[in-house]
């Protein structure tokens, strides 16, 4: 259904909906929740909240109000329920966002997330389309959370690598979002989540009418992610992502399979993927690297070629 005030809907597979309420203010609406990917309930709450809040940052906005979405089995201890909610609350406070209530239902397994409302100026909305030939793509978080959380279940990675992936997933995109909003000539932005870098890059490329080439050798990776991927520890979601983009992807002879696997890896609370001219990307990178030293240029956009995506 069309509405003149609906500035961003579901037609471009964007990260959130945006609705204009005045000439100065537009409301960003998004919702996200999932089952636990970690055993610690407080950490689960933090990660789920950071993941939900990320969509607002990807749209160029700031989150302001949220509602809890919680599904719990009867057997889940009350202390665990409390810890999940406290973890989510802690991230909301860090984001400057008020949790004003929510809804809880009984379910066979726990699920948690947020419905988030944010604000943005109608003229400063960032979308996942609009990349232009000559733009480079900047990624603000390393890849590998899907591979590593799969490896954790089999106790295959070191405690240090485990703690690092937990920290990455629980980190808000707030600082990165602030840096991106301050950057010049940002043409497109999205966050890298369940469809992996390949899937979200394809959505950006196809919606923008460009070809995006990703460079495997420049991808920032979480500690031990490459080792695990080379061992064949690849989550099922990565294969689904590869099937999704395969008709639209040219894999060049220089590509290494391990980097292709990690580009398809589904991310939880992943980083922002930003398209902007190279001359504007350099100062953005300098700002990002003051708090996210792994931030990197991972590809570039060009005039459309045979496929929307290329990987070398």
Where is each model-derived feature located?
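Helix-biased detector of long, well-ordered alpha-helical tracts
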Residues: 1-312
């Amino acid at each position: 259904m069309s509405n003149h005030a609906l500035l961003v809907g579901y037609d471009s597979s964007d990260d959130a909906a945006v609705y204009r309420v005045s000439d100065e203010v537009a409301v960003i609406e998004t919702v996200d929740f999932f089952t636990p990917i970690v055993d610690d309930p407080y950490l689960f709450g933090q990660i789920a909240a950071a993941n939900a809040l990320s969509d607002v940052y990807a749209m160029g906005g700031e989150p302001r109000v949220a509602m809890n979405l919680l599904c719990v089995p009867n057997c889940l201890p009350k202390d665990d329920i409390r810890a999940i909610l406290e973890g989510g609350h802690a991230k909301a406070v860090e984001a400057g966002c008020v949790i004003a209530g929510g809804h809880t239902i009984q379910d066979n397994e726990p699920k948690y997330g947020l419905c988030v409302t944010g604000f943005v100026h109608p003229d400063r909305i960032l979308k996942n389309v609009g990349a232009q030939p000559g733009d480079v793509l900047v990624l603000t978080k390393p890849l590998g959370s899907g591979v590593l959380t799969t490896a954790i279940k089999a106790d295959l990675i070191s405690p240090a690598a485990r703690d690092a992936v937990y920290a990455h997933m629980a980190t808000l995109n707030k600082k990165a979002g602030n840096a991106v909003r301050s950057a010049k000539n940002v043409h497109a932005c999205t966050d890298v989540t369940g469809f992996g870098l390949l899937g979200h890059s394809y959505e950006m490329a196809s919606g923008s009418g460009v070809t995006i080439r990703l460079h495997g050798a420049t991808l920032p990776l979480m500690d031990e992610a490459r080792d695990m991927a080379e061992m064949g520890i690849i989550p099922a979601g990565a294969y689904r992502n590869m099937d999704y983009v395969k008709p639209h992807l040219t894999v060049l002879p220089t590509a290494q399979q391990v980097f292709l696997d990690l580009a398809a890896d589904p991310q939880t609370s992943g980083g922002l993927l930003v398209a902007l001219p190279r001359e504007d990307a350099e100062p953005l990178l300098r700002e990002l690297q003051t708090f996210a030293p792994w931030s990197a240029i991972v590809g570039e956009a060009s005039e459309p070629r045979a496929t929307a995506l290329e990987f070398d």
